[in-house]
Amino acid sequence: MDSKVTTYAVLGSTGNCGSALIRNLLGKPQSRVHAFCRNKKKLLRLIPEIADSKQVEVFEGGMQDHDLLAACIKNTRAVFMCISTNDNVPGCRLSQDSAIALVKVMRELGYDKPDGGPNGPAPKLLLLSSGTIDPHLSKHLPSLLLWILKRSASHVYADLEKAEEFLRAQESWLTTIYIKPGALSVDKKRGYELSLTEQKDPVSYLDLSAGMIEAADDPEGRWDLKNISVNCGSTPAGFPDGTILCILMGLLRHYFPWTHAYLPMGMGPK
């Protein structure tokens, strides 16, 4: 591999965050992307320019295909974990199952060995989580709003908390950065800043992903093993369409889980 080329793996490439990561990395000529997704056709519809791009290699399959996942993450600097949902699905395990599968594959590749094994040092992981479940980052949110948000995505947050707990248990050999933004919006780039102290919202997915790349690339590892928020710069992103409906559907799923089968899916920022 060309020593000047840096390769990143994006898990969940067809989501808002995953696709924004790919778009930002395409703007860095020395970057290569291993895009992991369940549906290659969907990814090509979202980002048609990657069809003929030498910067992007698509890995189509599920997280339980360990050979495919291993090929995707080998020789990468960082693995962006963006597999989640905006729907408050009862019993949600997307983040947990992704973390468990990824760590198992990394162990199989020998990354847990003191010298990193034959495949070299382990890539950093960047888990897309939420500032809502971090008391320090969310300390300035109005208490009523925080109460509502925690319940409207309770199943998703429980999944994220367990995934984080699992990844923190691997920190003797594995470096994870926990990305915890506030509200997210499908909007243009407006500028961003990384913070260890507070969340400001909303921020666009393009700015969120740019901040994630900056954290992954930091030569001093200042963000390693930390909870960080990617905040808007001087101009906040537009208020995300669909937020109110997403919260209402999430509250129904929290208090009446049996209604899940009858409620619409695909909620969240538009």
From Swiss-Prot:
Belongs to the avfA family. It is an enzyme of class 1 (oxidoreductase). This is Oxidoreductase claK. InterPro entries: NAD(P)-bd_dom (IPR016040), NAD(P)-bd_dom_sf (IPR036291). Pathway: Pigment biosynthesis. Pfam families: NAD_binding_10. It comes from the Eukaryota. The keyword Oxidoreductase applies. Keywords: Monooxygenase, Oxidoreductase. It comes from Passalora fulva. GO terms for molecular function: monooxygenase activity. Induction: Expression is positively regulated by the transcriptional regulator wor1. Expression is down-regulated during biotrophic growth within tomato leaves. The expression is induced at later stages of infection when conidiophores emerge from the plant and produce conidia. Oxidoreductase; part of the gene cluster that mediates the biosynthesis of the bianthraquinone cladofulvin, a conidial pigment not required for virulence but that plays a role in fitness and resistance to environmental stresses including UV light and low-temperature stress. The pathway begins with the synthesis of atrochrysone thioester by the polyketide synthase (PKS) claG. The atrochrysone carboxyl ACP thioesterase claF then breaks the thioester bond and releases the atrochrysone carboxylic acid from claG.
